[in-house]
Amino acid sequence: MSKPIVMERGVKYRDADKMALIPVKNVVTERDALLRKPEWMKIKLPADSTRIQGIKAAMRKNGLHSVCEEASCPNLAECFNHGTATFMILGAICTRRCPFCDVAHGRPVAPDAEEPQKLAQTIADMALRYVVITSVDRDDLRDGGAQHFADCITAIRAKSPEIKIETLVPDFRGRMDRALDILNATPPDVFNHNLENVPRIYRQVRPGADYNWSLKLLERFKEAHPEIPTKSGLMVGLGETNAEIIEVMRDLRRHGVTMLTLGQYLQPSRHHLPVQRYVSPEEFDEMKAEALAMGFTHAACGPCVRSSYHADLQAKGMEVK
């Protein structure tokens, strides 16, 4: 019998090391079993990387993290080249170990009390008008990190009064009441929490999370702030069916969610969950039409769409795909 892995605080566990800690075991994908990417999934890199390197340098200077880098987002080059980024607070080590996600797992260090001010100054220096703030899961904190979110929102607005702030929050498992009490006092301009996939394969895709809990979080925030858009997103290609996706969309509308994102799942490494199918642009267009017919005010649906992809345009109701 193998000895249990003892995690050291502050150490990032990735790929095989991370997957070894997941209760639902995933079989490493052999190279010849990988699905070939279709033409529509091939991303062109910008010829000039000056802006990209500038944003990375600003992050490093202030000890900040972006989910774009930590989660290996395929849109990083495009977004950084346009001067946009999704900031990830509360460190770069997640207490969860979802097998679709490339963010490192482990025992995180204490939150940086100076991070809200450093984040606010960086955003002001970049002259951003719309910013997305997300975080790793912090099940080690009594409020799940909600107060840190609130502190960041307050600091950002103090330095950039005209800015619009979208928060992409974790599920605050076991801490919803405390977290919402804090966030209700300092709400963002858009409240985002991703369901990620469909109930049938939830335990495999999001071990440690609960589908109905996430729906309740979105519903309760909307009840407290009916004027603030609520948003959620799914990855497709993990084994779900289009019919199941449509049913999740109905669940989201029943819980008051007004904005939707749907994008293609891409396997970060052979140790992560494999891609089961590539959904065509035409299928995404059909699901977008279904979403708008259900009453979503905006639906960004396309192979390269991610939750915060062109989030400023999404918030304005402009076409994103």
Curated annotation (Swiss-Prot):
Binding site for [4Fe-4S] cluster 1: C68, C73, C79, S308
Pathway: Protein modification; protein lipoylation via endogenous pathway; protein N(6)-(lipoyl)lysine from octanoyl-[acyl-carrier-protein]: step 2/2
Domain Radical SAM core: 80-297
Reactions catalysed according to its record: [[Fe-S] cluster scaffold protein carrying a second [4Fe-4S](2+) cluster] + N(6)-octanoyl-L-lysyl-[protein] + 2 oxidized [2Fe-2S]-[ferredoxin] + 2 S-adenosyl-L-methionine + 4 H(+) = [[Fe-S] cluster scaffold protein] + N(6)-[(R)-dihydrolipoyl]-L-lysyl-[protein] + 4 Fe(3+) + 2 hydrogen sulfide + 2 5'-deoxyadenosine + 2 L-methionine + 2 reduced [2Fe-2S]-[ferredoxin]
Protein's cellular compartments: Cytoplasm
GO cellular component: cytoplasm
Enzyme Commission designation: 2.8.1.8
GO terms assigned for molecular function: 4 iron, 4 sulfur cluster binding; lipoate synthase activity; metal ion binding
Cofactor note (record): Binds 2 [4Fe-4S] clusters per subunit. One cluster is coordinated with 3 cysteines and an exchangeable S-adenosyl-L-methionine.
Family per record: Belongs to the radical SAM superfamily. Lipoyl synthase family.
Designated name of the protein: Lipoyl synthase
Protein's organism: Salmonella typhi
The encoding gene: lipA
